[in-house]
Amino acid sequence: NVLIDDVIGTALFTLLPCDPADLASCDFTHAAFAGEDLRVLIGQITTAGDLTGQLQVQVFVEGDADQEFRGIIPFTPYAPELLVDGCIDPAACNYDGEATADDGSCVYCGAECAGGSDYSMTVELHVEDVVAGQTTYRFYQNMINPDDFLSSVYGNEDAPFVFETTTGFYNSQFGGSVASAINPAFLSFFPDLAADSWVTIGIESQNVGDEVAISTCL
C-alpha cells in the first residue's frame, strides 16, 4: 500500500510544454493535456484484492497556470455493478448519501457546480491474468476541457495520497514506481512487466521524442 501524509509530502509532476504567457505556443498533443477523450492516465495497479484511496491533483484549467483547480479526488472499490450515480460532495445542497460515483450534478447554494466534483477519477479494468490470479486496473483523471493540463498529482499532511488494496500490489523487478521507468523493449522478454504497478501523468512507458519523463519532488 502507498500512504503519503507527512508535512513535506510528495509530488509527481510534469512541466507545461509552452510559454505560460503564450498559450498558442502549447503542444496540445502532450500527454498531460486532456485531449478529445477528456481524461489523462494517472496510474496502473495490479492486484488480486479490492482498491480504495484518494489523491490530490493540480489542473491548469484550459492550460492557464493562473487558473488552476486543486482538489482531492477519491475512488471507491472497483465494482461497476455496485456504483450509484449522484452527488457525493457533503457540501452540496443535493448531497446524496447513497451515491458512490459522482455524476457532476452537485448544486451549491442554488448555483450549478462549476468545479470541484466535475473533476473526478475513473478506475477501469485494463487486463486480467498477466500475472495469474491478478487484475490490472488503470486510473484516469477526468477533465472538463480538452486543453485542461494535469500539472501534478500529490499528497501531504493536509491531503494524503492513498492507494490501498486488500492484498497488496504487483511490482515487476524490471519496472519502476513511475511509468517512464517502463522499457517497452523488455516486454517480450519479461511479459509480467506489462502488469507492473506505477503512477504517471499521461504516458504509459519510457518517454519518447518530445515527451518529458515523469518527475517526482520529495
What are these regions (language model features)?
Residues E81-E112:
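Extracellular calcium-associated, cysteine-rich motifs in secreted modular proteins
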Residues N1-V84, A111-L218:
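Non-catalytic macromolecular-recognition regions in eukaryotic signaling proteins
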